């Protein structure tokens, strides 16, 4: 690519010489640099989409057609963005080339398979759709924190971000060390994947991990100083003959043959919930997953809904019994847009509740609310968990539960 930049520079130099010979103004330095970068992006990166991906403050990019782009920043501000293509056909071709070259394996994007999900080279998540929409559309979730911790003096961490306080960070780290199975739930964009990364980074670097995702985005295998022994698995869609599909449920079942110390499911989206619960209850203690949910309690109903739609058609009471034997804690993350005294918008994310799973009957999953929402909605200590002794063995200080207001910064 350095050679390409040199060649682009040479061509622009020749262009400027021709302009001077023709008594026309050459490109000034800023214009020349901008054109060189645009040509490089078009040839080797993602064209007009690339400058948006390079913006560290952007969190979501929604494309409703080639000329309708919406940008959502980390503080929740939404503004219109520049066009990224000149026509529907050009946008489809851009997405198709991304599917062919940018992911872990080539993925189709055509009339026969008009939906695409994949991880971009820089770790961001892309979802695209065509044919069933009036115009081709695309959404990109930028993962601003690829390497993140619960608490860390020198790296990105949830404590500094205000997602957890000191007491929560200590509690969750102890849960990970004690190999408790944890489900992270919350609405879209709440920061579930970021929390999952932070919890995973509290594990010992030598532990063997297997991650399963619909589209690779966790990236734990890319940080060898944090995770030395990782297999990253990605679901695969069928080929043009309709063959070769490998579903997430199949991959979760397969993990049991590969000696995992922990199994991590990036996002539970369907019938893989049954395989995941089986894996968690069959010796893979300390496993993690995320799931969409509007409340802590609805997390269990969401799992029951997925299991009911699976090939096994499980009754809710059966799923609840599986949850009792598989899940130790549910960490629920809440998000909202806050307006400061100056009127500026700010997206706020924080843990609102931590549930400990106790038992289940035919109707409900009984839980113990270990951390409950305080007056401002942020989680504060409420009821010590039944497994407190296990956490103490891993270095947790039980006196941290004696502060009913938590350690949140004002």
Give the predicted meaning of each segment.
Residues 1-109, 117:
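N-terminal accessory targeting/assembly segments
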Residues 61, 128, 263, 284, ...:
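Residue-level signature of catalytic and energy-coupling elements of molecular machines
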Residues 72-178:
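P-loop NTP-binding catalytic core
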Residues 179-182, 198-324, 334:
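Switch/coupling sub-region of P-loop NTPases
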Residues 186:
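The Walker A (P-loop) glycine that initiates the GxxxxGKT/S ATP-binding motif of P-loop NTPases
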Residues 189:
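Walker A (P-loop) phosphate-binding loop of P-loop NTPases
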Residues 192:
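Conserved lysine of the Walker
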Residues 341-410:
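NTP-binding/hydrolysis catalytic cores, primarily Walker-type P-loop NTPases
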